[in-house]
Structures are given as C-alpha cells and as structure tokens.
Amino acid sequence: MFWTRLLSGIVLLAIALATFSFGNVFLAVPLWLISLIAYRELTKALKCATDEKKFNALEWIGFVGVTAYYATLFFTRDHTLLLMCIVALFMAEMFCYVAAFPKYQASQVMAAVFSFLYAPVLLSFAYLTRECENGIYLVWLIPVSYTHLTLPT
C-alpha cells in the first residue's frame, strides 16, 4: 500500500510539475478532466447519482455546466461570465427539479450544485492563479500548502 501511494504521488507530482510549468491549455485541459471526474465522484458520494453506471439529468446538467465554465474560463477573461455560468447551472438544476418533480429530491439538487461549486470551481482557481501576473511562481503555493496540511504531525 505504501509503495502504491508513493508511486502515485511521484506520478502526480510529475504531472503537476509539467502542467503548472506550461500553463495555458496544458493546465486547463487536465483541470477540466479532473473537474469532471471530481464532480462525478462527489455526486456519487452525496447520493445525487441514482445509478452507479448511468448518469441522471442532474449530473448531465452538471457536466455541461463544468464544460461551459471551463470554456468560459479559457476563452474569455471576464469573471462576470464565470459568475453567470454558476447562476445558469443553478437555474438549470432548479428547472430540472421542477420539471421532473417527483423524480428528484431537493437534497439531490443541492448536492449537484454543491458538487459543482466545490470541485470544478475550486480547481479552476489553480488555472486563474497560474494565468495572473507572476502566476508561474504563485501557483506553486497551492500544492505546497496542500502538502503542509496532509503531512502527519
């Protein structure tokens, strides 16, 4: 178990080194893919996903929202549009809840929205940090601070 964790940590460090160093599309695409995976895992953990194998409408709306959010993040530098993506996702999730009322519970909709706000939006700040002035230096504070939090005391 230790060697598996060590090896995966080394591989992830190499990937982080490459993506953080190059930035731009080399950072945006892996973050988008990781965000999609993280969104799916969070929706499963929070019982938003009704089936382990298939996606429900709330998850599809979330996947489209994650993709729209990252497309907006990459192709524009307007933070107002990013906020509009978040609001649009919320409105779409609520519309789905109302349109298919007995099918979904309110807790599932809240879990879908929270999963979007927690994983994809949080991860996008690595890209935003990297793309700002002196971001090539500042972005390294993110994994360093995470390492500090996970080390045993």
Locations of the language-model features?
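Membrane-embedded alpha-helical bundles of polytopic integral membrane proteins
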Residues: 2-146
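Conserved small/polar residues in nucleotide/adenosyl-binding loops
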Residues: 147-153
